[in-house]
Amino acid sequence: MAVFSTNLVIYKFTDFEQTFVLEDSQSNSAKDLTGFTGTCKMQRTLNLGSLTAFNLAFTNRALGKVRITLTSTQTANIADGKYFYELMLTDPNGVTERVIEGVVIVKHPVTYPSDPPLTPFVPQVP
């Protein structure tokens, strides 16, 4: 299976969800993912730093559908910035390959207060 590259945007304090539909590169039809396992992780620098794991679910194995998610609690704990991610699948024979990769941009939504809340400055008058 060829590696597909796509970029993602995640907003802190919100739930994140992305569904991918994988195709068999030889037949151009849905990739049957019966018996496959998978992981999807992101990190700030390639091959360095801590990893953040996405929740991964096969929503329809016969049609090649894989969903990655993060809860609002998980996104709240990710620093704003640029990350790299990859989705790895392992077939029933134990062969692991990267099927999707790309850049993740984590943003702080404008409509949410900064974390932690700011204390208002009150000047003292002598």
List the predicted regions and their residue ranges:
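Contiguous segments within soluble domain cores/interaction surfaces
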Residues: 1-126
